[in-house]
Each structure stands twice: as structure tokens, then as C-alpha cells.
């Protein structure tokens, strides 16, 4: 499947194909960046033989992150582990086709490299460092940020009491909405 055809399905599978054009275009660029970063890093890691065994106290074990190395016979999977892909026959929309066309070839770069543009569908009001969720690699562009525009500082979520207070609250955030119009614009009817 060609990259742009793949992205048409990904965007229509991960979010509503009737979302605003601006949102669809942003999703196209993010998803294309993630995909091309994965393909490049998979090729690089296979060339560098990253399949290693490690010995710890005389016990042999195989250590790796669940990532692009999980897929030997194909590039990416069709579920949320990679990007939700429901096939090229997935119902799309003219707006998705327009978003793909208008962003053709556009990707996110940082320091001369295509960004690992992973994102999440669930939100607790603040993001986390990449290395705390995925693999022990620091990306300066994937650090904690609040999911709102107020001026309050991010609480120290490494402090148990602060974290408990945060988790038991309903933090003000863009994703903490019950507005049915907003939800229907961004979510498919099965999310």
C-alpha cells in the first residue's frame, strides 16, 4: 500500500473522516511523520543488528521495546500499537482526500530528523516524557505539557500526594469535554 493511501485509511480509522479540514491536515502530517520515522528507524536498526541478547547474572534474556522490531514480515500493524488502519476500503471522505493532497510529503522535523510523532487518544490533562512511556530515548520535543491554555504550572506528579490529587480531580483540559458536537467531530462512532 502506498504511503498516501495508507494515511487516508489511518486518518479515517483513527478519527472521524468528517472532522474539520485543519484537524485532518494536522493528523495527516503527524501520522506521516510517525510512519516515515518508523520505516527509517526499522531499516536502520535492522542494518545495525539490534536484535541482541543480554546476560544478567548468568541468565540469558532478550530485551526489546514493543515497537517497530515487533514486525519482521511487515512494516507496521493495523491496530493502535502502530496506527489504526482498517484497510483501503475504509469509508473516507472528500475532506480526508483533500487533507492528504494538501499536505503531501509534509512531515515534522527536529534537529534535521523526522520526528517520532507518537500521540495518544486518552488524556489526563498533561503529557509525559517520551522515555517514560515508550523507550529510553529522550526527544526534546516530547516532554510534559499541559493540555490547556491556563497559566498554572504542571503539578509535580512524581510526588504521591500531588499525583493522587491530580488523578482524583477533573483537570481542566481540551480533552476533558462532554460537548457532543466536539466529540462527534473528532471521534468515530465506535470510539
Predicted regions and their residues:
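Conserved, single-site charged/polar hotspot
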Residues: 1-191
Amino acid at each position: 500500500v502506498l504511503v498516501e493511501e495508507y494515511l487516508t485509511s489511518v486518518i479515517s480509522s483513527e478519527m472521524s473522516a468528517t472532522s474539520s479540514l485543519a484537524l485532518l491536515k494536522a493528523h495527516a502530517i503527524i501520522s506521516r511523520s510517525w510512519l516515515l520515522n518508523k520505516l527509517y528507524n526499522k531499516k536502520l536498526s535492522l542494518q545495525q543488528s539490534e536484535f541482541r541478547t543480554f546476560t544478567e547474572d548468568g541468565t540469558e534474556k532478550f530485551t526489546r521495546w514493543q515497537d517497530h522490531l515487533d514486525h519482521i514480515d511487515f512494516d507496521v500493524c493495523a491496530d493502535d500499537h502502530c496506527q489504526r488502519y482498517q484497510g483501503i476500503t475504509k469509508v473516507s471522505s472528500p475532506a480526508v482526500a483533500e487533507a492528504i493532497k494538501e499536505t503531501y510529503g509534509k512531515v515534522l522535523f527536529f534537529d534535521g530528523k523526522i520526528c517520532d510523532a507518537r500521540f495518544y487518544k486518552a488524556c489526563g490533562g498533561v503529557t509525559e516524557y517520551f522515555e517514560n512511556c515508550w523507550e529510553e530515548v529522550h526527544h526534546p520535543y516530547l516532554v510534559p505539557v499541559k493540555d490547556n491554555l491556563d497559566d498554572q504550572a504542571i503539578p509535580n506528579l512524581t510526588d504521591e500526594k500531588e499525583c493522587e490529587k491530580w488523578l482524583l480531580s477533573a483537570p481542566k483540559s481540551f480533552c476533558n469535554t462532554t460537548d457532543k458536537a466536539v466529540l462527534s467531530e473528532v471521534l468515530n462512532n465506535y470510539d
